[in-house]
């Protein structure tokens, strides 16, 4: 006698599976572009079944935003007070690497949380920063321990912002060592003989199209692309919303133009910085100083390009992804020449770690632009890279 079909058994950890899948989708696509249908499909259930666990997309998003923060707090609670900095950084690194696919949610997308949820998340990360800060101060009695702590966390968090294939244990070891070097770096000991970085200026808007772009960039940076309306952009340049379409087919084309401008300015700055460098070590120093200068000088433009790139349609995103890869390839090549013991994947992970330092240290300094701040952050980037 043949047994009839067996009904599928619902896994007991269905809610956890949903949160994990949602974290990946939110991290890859952004909050507004993510759909409950896509999340449900990734879990292998219907959207209707998904709504039995979460009443709406925001509720699911808010839980995703909490997952890694809760994991970090729990991991650090298991590290005894007064433990070596290595133990603290290792605990943070293990949780972050384990949540690599979904960890990008907190860096850019957390701005879409409501005020109460954002304050709660900020308090959790504040606890993490406090534990790292305490250990950094205890182990390396140097200036700017808070800056060094957030920069070290920037190294670790960088793994959530790219897709370089690397074994989990190798990633943990590489990031922990890099973060430890950052914590031990004296930002005040930055090279005083380094020549100032001169970047190409952002183009002066001389046409209505350029004026629209210049007005849209700070709005996108402040509120997020999805939250900014055509009406807001039009009002900023004294136009009726319908008049925007004479210059751009749609709002997404304004975003694409902003991202292209960011890529062009960075590429020009890199070309200038590498002119007449003496060798690979000096080349990496020049690259670091240039990227830091670019990030401080073009903060709004850079944040838009970093946060919103994934939301562009594939046809508009393609050339930008190529430019991004070419930029990283320059860093990787020069870093491997300066540190021949690194393989390509290790070098690439460290390059992204350097970018993570700039993001978190810049935020910690509230992007106050000065020669001192630029020099300090550049020193921390070089520490992350092992130079």
Tell where the protein language model's regions lie, with residue ranges.
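Amphipathic alpha-helical segments used for helix-helix packing
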Residues: 93-119, 153, 295-315, 355-359, ...
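Amphipathic alpha-helical packing segments from all-alpha helical-bundle domains
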Residues: 115-140, 146-147, 173-174, 315-340, ...
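Hydrophobic, ordered structural segments
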Residues: 68, 89-115, 136-191
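Alpha-helical DNA-contacting segments of helix-turn-helix folds
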Residues: 54, 61-68, 255-262, 305
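Helix-turn-helix
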Residues: 17, 21, 25-59, 223-253, ...
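Hydrophobic alpha-helical connector segments
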Residues: 76-102, 272-299
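Short hydrophobic clusters on alpha-helical segments that form packing/core surfaces
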Residues: 18-26, 212, 216-220, 262, ...
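C-terminal peripheral helix-coil segments that are non-catalytic and often amphipathic
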Residues: 2, 126-141, 165-226, 367-387
């Amino acid at each position: 006698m043949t047994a009839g079909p067996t009904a599928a058994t619902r896994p007991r950890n269905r809610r956890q599976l949903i949160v994990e899948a949602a974290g990946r989708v939110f991290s890859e696509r952004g909050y507004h572009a993510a759909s409950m249908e896509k999340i449900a499909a990734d879990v292998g259930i219907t959207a209707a079944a998904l709504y039995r666990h979460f009443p709406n997309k925001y509720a699911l998003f808010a839980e995703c935003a909490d997952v890694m923060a809760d994991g970090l707090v729990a991991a650090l609670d298991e590290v005894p007070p007064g433990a070596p900095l290595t133990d603290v950084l290792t605990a943070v690194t293990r949780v972050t690497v384990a949540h690599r696919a979904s960890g990008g949610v907190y860096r850019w997308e957390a701005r879409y949380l409501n005020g109460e949820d954002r304050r709660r998340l900020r308090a959790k990360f504040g606890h993490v920063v406090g534990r790292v800060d305490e250990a950094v101060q205890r182990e390396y009695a140097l200036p700017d321990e808070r800056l060094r702590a957030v920069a070290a966390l920037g190294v670790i968090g960088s793994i959530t912002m790219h897709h370089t294939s690397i074994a989990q244990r190798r990633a943990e070891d590489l990031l922990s060592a890099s973060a430890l070097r950052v914590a031990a770096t004296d930002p005040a000991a930055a090279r005083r003989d380094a020549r100032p970085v001169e970047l190409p200026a952002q183009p002066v808007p001389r046409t209505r199209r350029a004026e629209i772009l210049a007005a849209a960039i700070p709005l996108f940076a402040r509120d997020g692309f999805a939250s900014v309306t055509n009406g807001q952009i039009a009002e900023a340049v004294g136009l009726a919303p319908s008049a925007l379409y004479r210059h751009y087919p749609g709002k997404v084309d304004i975003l694409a133009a902003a991202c292209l401008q960011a890529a062009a300015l960075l590429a020009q700055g890199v070309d200038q910085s590498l002119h007449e460098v003496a060798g690979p070590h000096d080349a990496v120093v020049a690259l670091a100083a240039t990227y830091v200068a670019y990030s401080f000088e073009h903060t709004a433009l850079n944040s838009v390009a970093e946060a919103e790139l994934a939301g562009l349609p594939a046809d508009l995103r393609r050339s930008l992804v190529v430019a991004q890869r070419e930029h990283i390839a320059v860093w990787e090549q020069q870093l491997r020449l300066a540190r021949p013991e690194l393989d390509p994947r290790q070098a690439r992970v460290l390059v992204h770690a350097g970018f993570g330092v700039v993001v978190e240290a810049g935020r910690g300094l509230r992007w106050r632009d000065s020669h001192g701040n630029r020099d300090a952050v550049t020193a921390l980037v070089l520490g992350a890279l092992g130079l």
